[in-house]
Amino acid sequence: MRIRSSWEAAIDITAPAQGKGLIMPNEQLPGIEQAFGVLRQFTRSRRSSSEPLERCELCSAGLAHEHPHLVELATRTIVCACDPCALLFDNAAIGKYKRVSRRALRLADFAMTDAQWDGLLIPINMAFFFRSSLENRVVALYPSPAGAVESLLPMEAWQEIEESHGALMQLKPDIEAFLINRVGHAHGSAQAEYYIAPIDDCYRLVGVIRMHWKGLSGGAEVWTEIGRFFSDLRVRSEVISEVPHA
């Protein structure tokens, strides 16, 4: 038995009676059409909501909202991946990609003097540092309205800080970064914050600033979004006591 479509059922209802069906007064037709219009919209929305918003950039499989990320080492590009593809690059020592770590640590008692910070030659009060396995060096980046900007890092200044703090010696190359937020400290409104953060979170911070920055000072919206970013990171981070080396 063939099942009729909604449109066919509507035609039967409104057609002249030939020993079957029901004659519907003409004034009720708009209501019928409106009802089927709502039904079509509901069907389309159900279908579209079941489709994945993102796809794996390696195999094109549909992705859930929460999914793994890879970093392409040569370009420092963050790549969305499905679980099976991400597993191929889990703890990878060599290759084109590495799976991004999900570890987030807040270094509660990390100490850095203003002189040490100035020695890193970062022009703003926010930056992140990661060890590049391809370049065999520490890369310093800071967010800007134009995106991530690399800063030439004075290695002596970095080594002085790194050698005094064991947590920095344990950074996983390419996939973790030392993230510093000294904005509140510079304005005397909050303490400086220091994190070991997934590298994709650091690039997400760059994206937040690039998307919301307006004018010369950024505007209220961007500072609200920056505050929201660090509030979220604070909640997700494990707090550890960072004991400086002697």
Residue ranges: model-predicted function:
Residues 2-4:
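Basic polycationic patches enriched in arginine
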Residues 160-246:
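C-terminal, charged low-complexity interaction regions
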Residues 24-104:
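N-terminal cysteine/histidine-rich coordination modules
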Residues 125-187:
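Conserved, surface-exposed functional patches that form binding/active-site neighborhoods
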Residues 83-149:
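Long, charge-rich boundary regions
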